[in-house]
């Protein structure tokens, strides 16, 4: 198959074709340097300017105040599960966690290795299909931060509200939703996101952190590469940053502006998700496990009423150019991820195929 397909994978995910073409055109000779972006030193004026421009674009998109630092860090977002408690916990502290899916469960277990974490709500017994009522929890007096995952990529669960913490810093794993919907940065102490969903290719993690959270040095001392303060003081150049990822992210930030900004892509994301959910709700052939009030608009999980047909479904979808619809290995089933770069045409093609498959196999 020579033409582009629709990639419904949870990440790495689709990128806009125009961005890929731009990167292709610039690959051998970036900005008339005679070098590829992959070859240029990270402390050169060109790359320092690239990082500065990327940061400014992100600040404009999200209206990030000056009292927040923006960090471009190398590596997986999962590393933040350890970095957050290591940086933000002091002796005697206990961090509070909402466990609403696989990723927040992993984050809690990582923090609990320090024996300084407790959970406000654990939805695992119910199958991670809903979000807790926010009247049910009570924070301990020694809580330095509250952690939650607004959108659970694996389980397809989304918080319909921002938890109220009474002034305690709120930490959010926005790996699968940052830049997909409007947010008020001032409601958060720290936000982080892996880039491979809505931002760039895998290997970059963006951290947005309030300056107040950098005032206290971690106790006991932690490795310098894991210290947010070091990265903030060096403007993401404490070590070699993932330059190519930042380059693609910078292009993505500008692309989002051409799409009407965050509000524009959010409106389209809502329409895409609503269209697919409407079809799923109209048929008994497909099952949707997540309660309606907690449904993700990024990661739509579903299954077949006849599970033994799942592989046939995937094989036929692949032949139609509908890729990566298999659910996560922890949950099984099927999943369609509708990130910013997924066009409505992809959703239409998926629904057309699903309808045909249901008629032929129902």
UniProtKB/Swiss-Prot annotation:
Residues with N6-(pyridoxal phosphate)lysine modification: 197
One Gene Ontology term, aspect cellular component: cytoplasm
Note describing how the cofactor binds: Binds 1 pyridoxal phosphate per subunit.
Pathway noted in the entry: Amino-acid biosynthesis; L-serine biosynthesis; L-serine from 3-phospho-D-glycerate: step 2/3; Cofactor biosynthesis; pyridoxine 5'-phosphate biosynthesis; pyridoxine 5'-phosphate from D-erythrose 4-phosphate: step 3/5
Keyword field: Amino-acid biosynthesis, Aminotransferase, Cytoplasm, Pyridoxal phosphate, Pyridoxine biosynthesis, Serine biosynthesis, Transferase
Subcellular locations according to the entry: Cytoplasm
GO-annotated molecular function: O-phospho-L-serine:2-oxoglutarate aminotransferase activity; pyridoxal phosphate binding
Enzyme Commission code(s) on record: 2.6.1.52
Biological processes per GO annotation: L-serine biosynthetic process; pyridoxine biosynthetic process
Catalytic activity reported: O-phospho-L-serine + 2-oxoglutarate = 3-phosphooxypyruvate + L-glutamate; 4-(phosphooxy)-L-threonine + 2-oxoglutarate = (R)-3-hydroxy-2-oxo-4-phosphooxybutanoate + L-glutamate
Chain residues that bind pyridoxal 5'-phosphate: 77-78, 103, 153, 173, 196
Family assignment from sequence similarity: Belongs to the class-V pyridoxal-phosphate-dependent aminotransferase family. SerC subfamily.
Name of this protein: Phosphoserine aminotransferase
């Amino acid at each position: 198959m020579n033409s582009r397909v629709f990639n419904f994978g949870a990440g790495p995910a689709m990128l806009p074709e125009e961005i890929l073409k731009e990167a292709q055109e610039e690959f051998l000779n970036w900005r008339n340097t005679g070098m590829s972006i992959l070859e240029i030193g990270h402390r050169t004026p060109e790359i320092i300017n690239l990082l500065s421009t990327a940061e400014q674009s992100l600040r404009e998109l999200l209206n990030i105040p000056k009292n927040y630092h923006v960090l471009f860090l190398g590596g997986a977002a999962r590393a933040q599960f350890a970095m957050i408690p290591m940086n933000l916990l002091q002796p005697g502290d206990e961090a509070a966690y909402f466990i609403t899916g696989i990723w927040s469960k992993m984050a809690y277990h990582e923090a609990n290795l320090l024996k300084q974490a407790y959970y406000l709500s654990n939805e695992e017994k119910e199958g991670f299909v809903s979000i807790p009522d926010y009247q049910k929890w009570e924070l301990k007096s020694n809580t330095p931060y509250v952690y939650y995952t607004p959108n659970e990529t694996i389980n397809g669960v989304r918080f319909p509200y921002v938890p109220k913490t009474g002034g305690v810093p709120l930490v959010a794993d926005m790996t699968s939703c940052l830049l997909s919907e409007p947010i008020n940065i001032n409601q958060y102490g720290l936000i982080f996101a892996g880039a491979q969903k809505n931002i760039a290719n895998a290997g970059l993690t963006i951290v947005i952190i309030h300056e107040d959270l950098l005032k206290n040095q971690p106790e006991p001392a932690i490795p310098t590469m894991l210290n947010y303060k070091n990265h903030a003081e060096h403007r993401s150049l404490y070590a070699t940053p993932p330059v190519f990822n930042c380059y693609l992210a910078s292009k993505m930030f500008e692309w989002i502006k051409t799409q009407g900004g965050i509000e524009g892509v959010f409106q389209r994301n809502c329409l895409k998700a609503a269209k697919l959910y409407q079809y799923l709700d109209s048929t008994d052939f497909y099952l949707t496990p997540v309660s309606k009030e907690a449904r993700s608009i990024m990661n739509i999980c579903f299954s077949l009423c006849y599970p033994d047909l799942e592989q046939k479904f995937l094989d036929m979808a692949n032949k139609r150019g509908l890729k990566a619809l298999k659910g996560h290995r922890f949950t099984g089933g099927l999943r369609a991820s509708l990130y910013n770069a997924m066009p409505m045409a992809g959703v239409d093609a998926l629904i057309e195929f699903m309808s045909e498959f249901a008629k032929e196999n129902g």
